[in-house]
Amino acid sequence: MKYSGWPEPGELVVGKIDEIEDFGVFVDLDEYEGKRGLCHISEVASGWIKNVRDHVNEGQTVVAKVLDVDESAQQIDLSIKDVNDHQRKEKIQEWKNEQKADNWMELAFGEDLDDETYAAIANELLAEFGSMYDGFESAAIHGKDALEDVDLSEEEIDAIVQTARNNVSVPYVQVTGYVDLSCPESDGVDIIKEALQAAEGNGEVPDEIELEVTYVGSPEYRIQVQAPDYKTAEDALEESADRAAKVVEQHGGSGQFHRERSEDDE
């Protein structure tokens, strides 16, 4: 997405060097429509510079810091040397992510999507998530729930969610725990089965969570959870064990959650 306005002083921008002069370099700003900045030779690199071309090349993609903006003069002053390696890598990754989001918008709404509609949808995602990429990632994880506060139509939300789930690689974490279940009742086997169904959530586990319960060795069962972050995963793990324990305890049995396998099983 290219912005139609102007960058702010202090902002980091991505651009391509399209002209090199003795006094500095001109940079086409990739994120701003029709905007070009000037990086004076003193802002290209630290120290004395004999030849600008020893430091940059035409066509090179750079990250620069905006020093000053004069809209009346159509001038943007930039500094390449004021951007450290960490900032550069972070900004380039952010820029690449937004390029991906641009492609996802095209997949979701078609190549013929007009600029006005594109901007309206993009601005809703930006306002809610800070970037289009984060909006698509959240939709991939949480589905429609992620977009409930976004002012978009049902059709637009469905298109975003479907595209996100087909194209966004979501980072997941995995946690494992164990629960010991026992029940002295004559129908104890059936009660344990009921407890395991409860542990698995009875079909009510949120879409962003994958939960599996497997048998280790009586009375121990393994619970494995995959989720977008550790807090969500840990909460789901403990809730799963609690559900199972509650079922057997209601029938005079016992349930105990622990993080490591019992020594007798190893």
Curated annotation (Swiss-Prot):
Transmembrane segments: none annotated. Keywords: Initiation factor, Protein biosynthesis, RNA-binding. GO terms for molecular function: ribosome binding; RNA binding; translation initiation factor activity. Residues 10-81 form the S1 motif domain. It comes from the Archaea. Residues 240-249, 257-266 have a biased composition (Basic and acidic residues). Pfam families: EIF_2_alpha, S1. InterPro entries: NA-bd_OB-fold, S1_domain, S1_IF2_alpha, TIF2_asu_arc, TIF2_asu_C, TIF2_asu_middle_sf, TIF_2_asu. Residues 233-266 are annotated as: Disordered. The keyword Lipid biosynthesis does not apply. Heterotrimer composed of an alpha, a beta and a gamma chain. Belongs to the eIF-2-alpha family. eIF-2 functions in the early steps of protein synthesis by forming a ternary complex with GTP and initiator tRNA. This is Translation initiation factor 2 subunit alpha. The gene is eif2a.
